[in-house]
Amino acid sequence: MGRLHSHRHGKSHSIRPSSPKAPSWIQGPGEVEDLIVKYAKEGLAPSQIGSKLRDQHAIPLTRPITGKSVTQIMEEHGATPELPEDLNNIVQKAVGLQRHLRANKGDRRNVRSLELIEAKVHRLDVYYKRIGRIPKDWKYKSVVAQLE
């Protein structure tokens, strides 16, 4: 699958564990769910929780053990963030680029980058409103028009 705003194909990806079975050293799904809820209450994003489970607790995948994804477990325990992780990451990237452009007025190339980032924000905005993940009245305010 190609990238959204480039001509590249996107070959990079992580290698999934070879065995879809649950590891033998895990006592049960309750232990994994407790860890996920604990890390979610500490403010970690779902991808950070997955990395922490993989690196520190030797749990490669949560779905074979619990039958649910990390975000589903977070939703069950009421520990989901107000914005989905991918939308939040793109909004944070746009905010950082806006801060950069305020300090560097002559950087015209990154004005275009900000336009592309904000296009991704609006695309995700429509999707998450349609599935009901964010409120219908949520609005991202564009800054590109003010910079030109």
Swiss-Prot record:
Residues 1-14 have a biased composition (Basic residues). GO terms for molecular function: small ribosomal subunit rRNA binding; structural constituent of ribosome. Residues 1-27 are annotated as: Disordered. Gene3D superfamilies: 4.10.860.130, S15/NS1, RNA-binding. SMART domains: Ribosomal_S13_N, Ribosomal_S15. GO terms for biological process: translation. Keywords: Ribonucleoprotein, Ribosomal protein. GO terms for cellular component: cytosolic small ribosomal subunit. Pfam families: Ribosomal_S13_N (PF08069), Ribosomal_S15 (PF00312). The keyword Ribonucleoprotein applies. Belongs to the universal ribosomal protein uS15 family. Part of the 30S ribosomal subunit. This is Small ribosomal subunit protein uS15. It comes from Cenarchaeum symbiosum (strain A).
